[in-house]
């Protein structure tokens, strides 16, 4: 698939400006689309839209299919008449406009959304009935999962009573009756989420802006997917994991990363012709124009860590499905636009899988000058970027460009200066030279995190892997979206042949 030179900005929905504690599908989202259009951009890349759980990571969701109710626009619910502006204004979402207070969000948004549901008369809404019927293949299990989880005070499903943990039919029937209105409440949230998201995406597309969605390779252990489909995962007869996902020790983490996600039972997927994965990707393309798949190397080989391990040091590599999976996807769905997140340790077989798939891989500028790299730093030097790639200054997992340059070794900073052949620009302005560097690379697509365009430090970092507590919290202030910055972005995008003229 031929890729035109283009550019975009990475900004999570959660990071949009908003008076209600977190970015959402409100007017601010539509304003950002307009801002992107005027800045000459083609893409808005976001992070996964799933229902977040403990730790607030969008990569650890209660479902591979459900959307995050935090993103539902309260203003839209006011317009519908199921909330009042006074009720929304009275809610305390925290004091900081550039931060997300998830504990307050859980309490205040939850209260308002339940209030909206109670006033909705949703049972007589034909569109809601049609939505539930169309999506029952995932929605019924998800809504029941969330309702039962609430009944068990938020405990992971592997700690529920045996009858419902193992989905015995009498227990399933009992909880569907007992928790009918709780189940309907969670279906209502998904109905409003999809209704509002589809409207926003249609608006973006009408302005020539395409949405790059993002999906993690794995589902969370505490998810409706694992509970409803235990045979597709490496679980024992009691539905307890036998092994979990992660990555091995490297220069960034001496004990590796223990993610804890259940691993796929690939032989079971193969026996169905990879139907679950085909369905998952089909659904993703209902929501997004382009899909980035996180940890793409896991399809070639995946790191298996014994369940119960405290670190990843005892893990080992096992063979994944390889190109066979993507041949099945292409046969079922046709050619679709997928970005392979092929970062980290790269073996020859992983490189071959990316080539065989035809998907563009990712190139991250920050990796090009880091002495902790695993041997592929030259792949990330901009003069080596192939056309069929997507160039980034950094991702949600990296330091902002400004802080990265401040924290690398003196010798590495010298390498950056030498590569740029720029010894005059002040350190605090050098991020602009680095952005221009990848914009003029051969990579067909170039995506810049919003924080890097703004020249922000690590106070605006989205995530620091293997840590909890202060991640996924940064929000953009509306005053930061200036006409001056918009003009500067448009000029650079135009200069390097990436402007969206649509």
Predicted feature locations:
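Catalytic domains of carbohydrate-active enzymes, especially glycoside hydrolases
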Residues: 27-52, 287-288
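Surface-exposed amphipathic alpha-helices with a cationic face
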Residues: 37, 197-205, 330, 354-355
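Conserved, well-ordered alpha-helix/loop/beta-strand core segments that scaffold catalytic motifs
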Residues: 186, 190-219
């Amino acid at each position: 698939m031929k890729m035109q030179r283009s550019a975009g900005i990475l900004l999570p929905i959660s990071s949009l400006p908003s008076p209600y504690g977190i970015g959402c599908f409100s007017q601010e989202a539509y304003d950002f689309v307009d801002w992107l259009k005027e800045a000459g951009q083609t893409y808005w890349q976001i992070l996964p839209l799933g229902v977040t759980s403990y730790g607030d990571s969008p990569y650890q969701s209660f479902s591979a299919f459900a959307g995050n109710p935090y993103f539902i626009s309260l203003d839209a619910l006011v317009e519908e008449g199921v909330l009042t502006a006074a009720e929304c204004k009275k809610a305390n979402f925290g004091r900081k406009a550039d931060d997300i207070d998830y504990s307050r969000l859980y309490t205040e948004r939850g209260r308002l959304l339940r209030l909206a549901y109670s006033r909705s008369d949703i049972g007589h809404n034909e569109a809601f009935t049609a939505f539930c019927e169309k999506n029952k293949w995932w929605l019924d299990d998800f809504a029941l999962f969330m309702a039962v989880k609430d009944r068990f005070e938020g405990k992971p499903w592997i700690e529920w009573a045996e009858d419902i943990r193992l989905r015995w039919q009498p227990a399933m029937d009992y909880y569907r009756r007992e928790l009918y209105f709780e189940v309907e409440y969670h279906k209502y949230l998904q109905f409003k989420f999809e209704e509002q998201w589809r409207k926003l995406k249609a608006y973006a597309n009408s302005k020539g802006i395409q949405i790059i969605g993002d999906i993690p390779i794995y589902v969370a252990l505490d998810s409706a997917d694992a509970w409803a489909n235990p045979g597709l995962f490496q679980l024992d007869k009691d539905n307890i994991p036998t092994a979990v996902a992660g990555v091995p020790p490297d220069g960034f983490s001496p004990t590796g990363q223990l993610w804890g996600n259940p691993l796929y039972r690939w032989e079971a997927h193969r026996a169905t012709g990879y139907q679950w994965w085909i369905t998952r990707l089909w659904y993703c393309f209902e929501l997004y124009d382009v899909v980035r798949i996180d940890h793409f190397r896991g399809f070639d080989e995946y790191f298996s860590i014994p369940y119960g391990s405290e670190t990843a040091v005892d893990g080992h590599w096992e063979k994944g499905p390889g190109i066979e999976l993507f041949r099945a996807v292409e046969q079922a769905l046709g050619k679709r636009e997928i970005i392979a997140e092929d970062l980290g340790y790269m073996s020859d077989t992983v490189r071959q899988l990316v080539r065989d798939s035809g998907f563009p891989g990712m190139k991250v500028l920050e990796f090009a000058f880091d002495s902790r790299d695993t041997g592929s730093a030259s792949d990330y030097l901009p003069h080596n970027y192939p056309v069929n790639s997507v160039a980034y200054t950094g991702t949600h997992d990296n330091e902002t460009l400004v802080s990265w340059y401040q924290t690398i070794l003196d010798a590495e900073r010298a390498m950056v200066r030498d590569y740029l052949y720029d010894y005059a620009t002040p350190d605090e302005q050098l991020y602009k030279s680095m952005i221009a560097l990848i914009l003029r690379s051969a990579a067909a697509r170039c995506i810049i995190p919003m924080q890097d365009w703004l020249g922000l430090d690590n106070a605006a970092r989205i995530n620091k892997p293997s840590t909890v507590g202060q991640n996924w919290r940064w929000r953009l202030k509306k005053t930061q979206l200036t006409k001056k910055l918009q003009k500067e972005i448009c000029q650079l995008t135009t200069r390097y042949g990436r402007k969206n003229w649509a």
